[in-house]
Amino acid sequence: MYSKSRKISRRDFLKISGIGLAGVFLGSAIAPWIKRIQQPTTNVTILREDSYQNNLEDSLRRGIAQYPNILKKIQGGRVVLKPNLVDHYPNRPLNTHPAMLAATIAAFRQLGAQEVIVAEGPGHNRDTEMIVEQSGVSQILKDERVRFVDLNLDDCTPIELVSRYTQLSRIFFPHTVLGSDLVVSMPKLKTHHWAGVTLSLKNLFGVIPGIKYGWPKNFLHWHGISQSIADIATTIAPGFAIVDGIVGMEGDGPLHGAGVDSNVVIMGDNLTAVDATAVRLMGFYPERIQHLLLMMPYGGTINEMRIKQIGESLASSQILFQPPPVVMTNINQAPSFWHKALVSGW
């Protein structure tokens, strides 16, 4: 015999509703954290290089060849190299070194790229041609017969953002980047007075066209630097990073810091993991870098236990950089156990 239906009292209804709402709230609060700590295991390569006069081409080619998924994109494909060209201040290591760029061009060609393009959209100085000439990159382009594209002036198309941390729905991206088979971010190993560090993810600011967003891309700065970095990276999904750390910059980067002989090249196909490794090499903590944390729900890895080091060990390569003076977080202050557990699943 079926039991009679029982009328739910107002008190019981509120209890049930409260439990349900609490469950929904808890689930919505925990879900991003669970997604964040489910970081993929990835490889990051550290190469020991103490001079730009070394045979960088062979080292880079061997390093890149350790990433089979990248080799597939290279062979017969169009590769866009995005160096870090900020400005030209003599005797300051502001930019990706021309020798590093030349070696990378040669390495990708040897690995089967049909076309290699160098592209950059500087945000600090509007005169891209002057920066390319004075930095020594112009001669490399001539010697290697490589086309250069000023991304500040390139044709562009508005693209729907993936992460939308900036609360923007779309950002204009240049056709040169959108039409490539592989985008390679080639930053300098530097500190940054606002973002903490400027590495492969921050370097992507230079793909945003100045003709749409001004100089120094102020429209995106107003929507948050870290948020903009993450929105750009999650949307164009660059495939590889090569960090020029043979000579880096510490202190008041990215323009006024001091040079550091850090003697490394760092590379990998998970840009967040590459940057997290570079941050540790500099003596800082990835858990303190906001844009790295924002990348974690989108496949970015900062958990050291999920980053397999290839080549040199992190411990043998580490050099303690002076932190930037203005950055809002103490990037050289070790986070607590609970902080690390909360942000990276330790």
Which residues does each predicted region cover?
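N-terminal and secondary-structure boundary signal
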Residues: Y2-W346
